[in-house]
Amino acid sequence: MKTLFMMLGVLAMVSGLRAQAEPAAATTGTMLAAPKVPTAAEALAAWQDFRADPLTRLDKTQPFLDFIRDSGQVHIVLNNSLLAWMYQPMDNTYKATLYAAFLGGNMAAQLAAQHRTDSDDVAGMESALDAYAAVRKAHPDFQLPLFESLAKARREHRLAEAVKNIDSDATPPP
């Protein structure tokens, strides 16, 4: 349950940061239609836009986050041990950037497999590590021990093994 609330909270945070970056939309007195779920192609295009410069492109995340949440075409399981960094105090922009990268990479890997599979935590962390490098480049003092450890594992071509070890250490939520 804690993981679900964390995911909803971060999605709200990403949406809020995105809304701050966009001008307010004009409103009318008519009823609004239910939002359309983005297609896989729209979600992947948004993912690529975000991925090009993740720290400054949070405004591009909504289509792929909506697709993940509403399409039913991907399934992402949030692992408390792998995402423990989410509970550490840090700038909300960094947290949203890393989390969106994790979700987007996971989504893209599942769509590339052309079928709904289990969560692809390795692809998610690979993308989160790319975003982490972008954050660190802009803010060299920012550091997360788990990401440093996983970056080292990636350099040594052991990322899949390291992620699997973290995944297997996870304890199920109460």
Model-identified regions with their sequence ranges:
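Sec-dependent N-terminal signal peptides
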Residues: L4-M13
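Mature extracellular/secreted ectodomains of secretory-pathway proteins
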Residues: T56-P173
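Sec/Tat signal peptide C-region and signal peptidase I cleavage site
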Residues: S15-A19
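Immediate post-signal-peptide N-terminus of mature secreted/exported proteins
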Residues: Q20-D66
